[in-house]
Regions:
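Long beta-strand-rich cores associated with HINT superfamily self-processing modules
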Residues: 1-109
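Intrinsically disordered, low-complexity acidic/polar and Pro/Ser/Thr-rich regulatory regions
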Residues: 106-118
Length: 118
């Protein structure tokens, strides 16, 4: 479903992709998975430079609920400096990331099977 959402975003006439990074196919060493887009959006509003229509820039991160939960935990660990056993936590986060990715694939397979019957 992530790639369907990415394709939909790319099809929008007022959205231009500036940069994209696929951390689902190119998983980070710590297990992080997500799809990042830097986009330019043309909107019928004046931008900070006074252009109308205006051009606005945004980052869009597309990921599953499981990926988002993992990213939130990893973010907390990264910025909390008084953690005991950080090596163990990093190892466990990587293991969880791999398990969540396998679960995401299984859930997508189930969804595809359900949709194939309709």
């Amino acid at each position: 479903d992530i790639y369907k959402n990415i394709d939909y975003l790319k099809s929008l006439p007022n959205l231009k992709i500036i940069k994209e990074k696929d951390y689902i196919k190119n998983v980070k060493p710590n297990g992080y998975r997500s799809y990042h887009l830097i986009v330019e959006i043309t909107a019928p509003y004046e931008d900070i430079l006074g252009n109308n229509p205006g051009k606005f820039f945004a980052e869009i991160q597309v990921r599953t609920i499981a990926m988002d939960s993992w990213a939130s935990l990893e973010h907390q660990m990264k910025y909390k400096h008084d953690i005991k056993n950080p090596e163990l936590i990093v190892k466990e986060l990587k293991r969880c990331a791999d398990e969540l990715a396998a679960c995401d694939v299984s859930m997508q397979t189930i969804r595809n099977l359900i949709n194939a019957e309709n």
